[in-house]
């Protein structure tokens, strides 16, 4: 995946917490990947600040990765397609994170009645790429909307 070739972790002190941002999923030359812009965006957007705080804990568990997904989905008015997230990807992610038949004891729910969701569940690597790509595109979207220019 070309977007995963360049991956960096940035830490920046903001207020009383540290924000760790996985930056440069596209290119270091992309002005929308500028760390200062991301930090400034977090200072004016509570949703961005919360996602950054959650990313500090990692996304290697279904509960935290789902929190990140929920915040972005809500912020985008449940229209993740404009971030390049397909309905199929969203369904695969939510089914994997939620259903114990797909993710075992680590799922968000202890029991879900009915049929097991059809289709291939996301692997942990798939989920990591899905979440970080979505975060990156969401930040780019917000910066492209000129939020910091106001």
Language-model segment annotations:
Residues 77-82:
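Short helix-loop boundary/capping segments
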């Amino acid at each position: 995946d070309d977007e995963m070739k360049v991956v960096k972790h940035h830490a920046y002190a903001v207020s009383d917490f540290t924000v760790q941002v996985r930056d440069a999923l596209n290119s270091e030359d992309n002005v929308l990947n500028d760390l200062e812009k991301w930090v400034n965006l977090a200072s004016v957007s509570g949703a961005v600040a919360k996602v950054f705080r959650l990313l500090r804990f990692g996304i290697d568990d279904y509960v935290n990765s789902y929190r990140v997904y929920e915040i972005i989905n809500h912020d985008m008015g449940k229209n993740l397609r404009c971030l390049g997230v397909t309905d199929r990807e969203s369904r695969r992610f939510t089914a994997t994170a939620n259903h114990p038949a797909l993710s075992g004891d680590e799922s968000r729910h202890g029991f879900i009645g009915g049929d097991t969701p059809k289709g291939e569940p996301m692997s942990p690597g798939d989920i990591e790429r899905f979440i970080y790509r979505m975060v990156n595109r969401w930040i780019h979207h917000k910066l492209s909307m000129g939020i910091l220019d106001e």
